[in-house]
Amino acid sequence: MVDRYIQGVIVFICSLLFVCGCDEHVDISETGDEDDIVTLLERKAMDSLFTNNAYSRSLLRKNMSQTADSLSYYRLMNVYSKACFAASQFDSVVYYSRIILHFCQKSSDSPQIHDLFSATYNMMGNVWGRWNFPDSAVVYYQKVYEHRKQGNELSYLPDICINLADGNVHKSDYTDAAYYYRRALFLCDSLGLPDRNKFPIYYGLGQTYMELRDFDLSNHYYEMAGRYFSQMSVPEKFTYLNNR
């Protein structure tokens, strides 16, 4: 029994190395733990969405054709829709998202299905945001939030609240925007997430209270955001200094 367990571990480790080191020969159907390999493939494809979009699509198409598990197939399809989004092919995002949602709607209720619902509605919200329909985007982001609460990947909840806040900013609904930014702060604390995650929240609150003409609170949150200046990326530093 122990020998068989060790063999299984060795096969799984070799599969991971195979995926990482030999991109063009990934074969998801031959791996021992498909869920872990799908997660790795999702990350691998996401890493190349903007730098090598064609590679991401090729990797995803190949493994979608090889997986025998429906959930794995539609998880990879969701990442494929993100590749379409990165290429500004928004109609394709909607097309694939509708296919995934149909699968989710006919599937048995589970945390994994709620995570997939959430990820798919998020893409729909992103598309409607890019099409400059913030009302529709917010409706989708609310669905994202409700499904994610019932899923496994709760660490995404603060980011979803930031999307809801940003959507309300674009609607000029600054009161609701402030509510969702504050909700994001609460979730960061309750989920024990790194303080670094709070920078965009503080920055968003600074902007929101500026629009509400509460300059004291605006300055307070800009100062809070500034505490993370050394940890900001170059674009974040530029945005912060340009608006401060």
Language-model features: where?
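A "functional boundary" signal
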Residues: 21-244
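Bacterial N-terminal signal peptides
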Residues: 10-17
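A subset of signal/propeptide-processing and intrinsically disordered low-complexity segments
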Residues: 5, 18-19
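Bacterial N-terminal signal peptides that target proteins for export
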Residues: 1-9
